[in-house]
Structures are given as C-alpha cells and as structure tokens.
Amino acid sequence: RVTARVGLGRGDVLDIERTVKLGGPIHSKGVLILGGFLRGRFARGDPLSLSASLVFEQSYGGIEGDSASLAELLALLSAIAELPLRQDLAVTGSLNQHGTVQPIGGVNEKVEGFFDVCAARGLTGQQGVVIPAANVKHLMLAPRVLDAVRGGHFAVYSVAHADDAVRLFFDREAGEA
C-alpha cells in the first residue's frame, strides 16, 4: 500500500523510503521522475507550491525498482485532489516525466498474485489489475485468471498514459475536479 500526504511547500516530493535508506537508486529515480511530471503538468507558468511525501506503509525491507511509480503518482493525485482512489484495482507500471506508462517486469506474477488475493476474498466482478499497455504482449496468464476474465469476474486493464489510469481510478478525466 502506497500513501501520500501533501501540503504547501516548494515543489518537493519526499521519498520516505530513500530518507530512511530502504529505497534503492532505481526507486529513488522513479520518485524524482514523479516530481518532473508534476512540474510539467501543474507548474509550467508558476512554481509548484507543493510539498509531498510518499511511503510504502508497513514496509520494513528494501524497496527497489520503478514499477510502482504509476501507483505513487495516483496516490499523490488523490492527496492533491482530495479524491479517493478505487480500492478494488491494483496497479503496476513505470512512468516517465511526460506521463507515458512504461513496461515492467513480472507482469504475469503481479496480475496472478492480485487475482489470487481477490479470489480468496471472493470475486465481485469489479476487481482487476491495471498494467502498462506495452506489457499486454507479455501476458501469459494462468487458466484460472483467464476464465475469470472471460466470465466477467475479474479484469485486466492496460494503460498507455497516466491520464488513462486517472480515468480508471477516479472515474473522471484528468483535470476534472
């Protein structure tokens, strides 16, 4: 679970994992890229008067990689807009400064892992996983997952841009209040 808090500040995004030496360099780079995205989207004419913090709650081991940077962006946008995120969707994806969602490793394991958790708790037909569009060609999901998707009990969504994920998680277009 990723959480974010925001307030007035100087455009800084504090990576708590890095500060306490639990975040590796690739994860830290991903958080810095989020700052670039936010500045490009919200501070093209004026400074970004924002201070934000990001953390993986109850994580006590090392965090490495950038496959959660889309999730971190969604957590930040939720905190900024004071809008809740859908909790029945998981998300994975790397992000560049322009909002393009980039491929990640282990896509099958990530989809199947969330599916198994949902199946153990009871499929509702609303649950699903959001993955990078560039990873669709890598999908080789287990028959149990394919059957649930075909039956409308679980979904796998692909996104090419952060705005596509905003649509799914907030049920509105990017930029709408």
Predicted regions, residues:
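Peripheral, non-AAA+ core regions of ATP-driven protein-machinery
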Residues: 3-22, 26-177
